Swiss-Prot record:
It is found in: Cytoplasm. Its main location: cytoplasm. GO terms for cellular component: cytoplasm. Keywords: Chemotaxis, Cytoplasm, Hydrolase, Phosphoprotein. Phosphorylated by CheA. Phosphorylation of the N-terminal regulatory domain activates the methylesterase activity. Belongs to the CheB family. Involved in chemotaxis. Part of a chemotaxis signal transduction system that modulates chemotaxis in response to various stimuli. Catalyzes the demethylation of specific methylglutamate residues introduced into the chemoreceptors (methyl-accepting chemotaxis proteins or MCP) by CheR. Also mediates the irreversible deamidation of specific glutamine residues to glutamic acid. Residues 5-122 form the Response regulatory domain. The modification 4-aspartylphosphate is found at D56. It comes from Shigella boydii serotype 4 (strain Sb227). It comes from the Bacteria. This is Protein-glutamate methylesterase/protein-glutamine glutaminase.
Length: 312
């Protein structure tokens, strides 16, 4: 089996050295070249034809976002962004995911070398996932058509969504067409702490429904989506006639919900960037219906209107 060929673009010589050490320490991948800026990277991409690019956000001559936008338009390839763990860094990273980056790695704020080496296994796994990603499914999505508003649904109705790699854009595509009469949505998206608040704020500006990072003890309301804070779990508890969020994901939970009577949806392979969580849920028997991403919003509201609880 051939190794995954990686090219790293970063203006820091130390970061290029660290990324080379990390990539070359795994037997299934190799660093074929490094570049100090996007203009050098452009020539190296032509020369080495890498499978995956790791790309810093802030660089001289051309920043990472400008380069990513041009790259995805002219020569699409799997990209893993390398970003600082700051408010500004999270905003830029979310924009990179919109432009077509598969995933991202956050730089530690202190002890760069020790911190990055501690992330070695995580970085390698992100590179492996990126190498297998479907670029066709990760093309920028056009704004979905707003769905027709129906009567306000009962606070008893809920939709739960779980997402991992490639999920940020899929979630946007699902939430954006939902009318204010939609039931409450509870969302778990695999992200580090700090990024989920920026993600929620970004969606809140784009969607008709309210979108926010969930808070412990918060009452769940129709017409709102609640995103679990990074690295935390989210549960529901009864509070009188209402539901209340408890901040504390995946295929096993989905199977349990189906067994309890929920109607469960999974995104199909053709529209997934990485067909990981949906495949596991389908294989475990936790899925009632498999649909294309473009049909998820409409199917959710149709099932809810018919009186069924939904988990996707």
């Amino acid at each position: 089996m051939s190794k995954i060929r990686v090219l790293s673009v970063d203006d820091s010589a130390l970061m290029r050295q660290i990324m080379t050490e990390i990539i070359n320490s795994h037997s299934d991948m190799e660093m074929v070249a490094t570049a100090p800026d996007p203009l050098v990277a452009r020539d190296l991409i032509k020369k080495f034809n890498p499978d995956v690019l790791t790309l810093d956000v802030e660089m001289p001559r051309m920043d990472g976002l400008d380069f990513l936008e041009k790259l995805m338009r002219l020569r699409p390839m799997p990209v893993v962004m390398v970003s600082s763990l700051t408010g500004k860094g999270s905003e830029v990273t979310l924009r990179a995911l919109e432009l077509g980056a598969i995933d991202f790695v956050t730089k530690p704020q202190l002890g760069i070398r020790e911190g990055m080496l501690a992330y070695s296994e995580m970085i390698a796994e992100k590179v492996r996932t990126a190498a297998k990603a479907s670029l066709a499914a990760h093309k920028p999505l056009s704004a979905p058509t707003t769905l027709k508003a129906g009567p306000l649904l009962s606070s008893e109705k809920l939709i739960a969504i779980g997402a991992s790699t490639g999920g940020t854009e899929a979630i946007r595509h699902v939430l954006q067409p939902l009318p204010l009469s939609s039931p409450a949505l509870l969302i778990t998206q695999h992200m580090p702490p700090g990024f989920t608040r920026s993600f929620a704020d970004r969606l809140n500006k784009l969607c008709q429904i309210g979108v926010k990072e969930a808070e412990d003890g918060e009452r769940v309301l129709p017409g709102h989506a609640y995103i679990a804070p990074g690295d935390r779990h989210m549960e529901l508890a009864r509070s009188g006639a209402n539901y209340q969020i408890k901040i504390h994901d995946g295929p096993v939970g989905m199977l349990a919900m189906r067994q309890a009577g929920a109607w469960t949806l999974a995104q199909n392979e053709a529209s997934c960037v990485v067909f990981g969580m949906p495949r596991e849920a389908i294989n475990m028997g936790g899925v009632c219906e498999v649909v294309d991403l473009s049909q998820v919003s409409q199917q959710m509201l149709a099932k809810i209107s018919a009186g069924q609880a939904i988990r996707i």
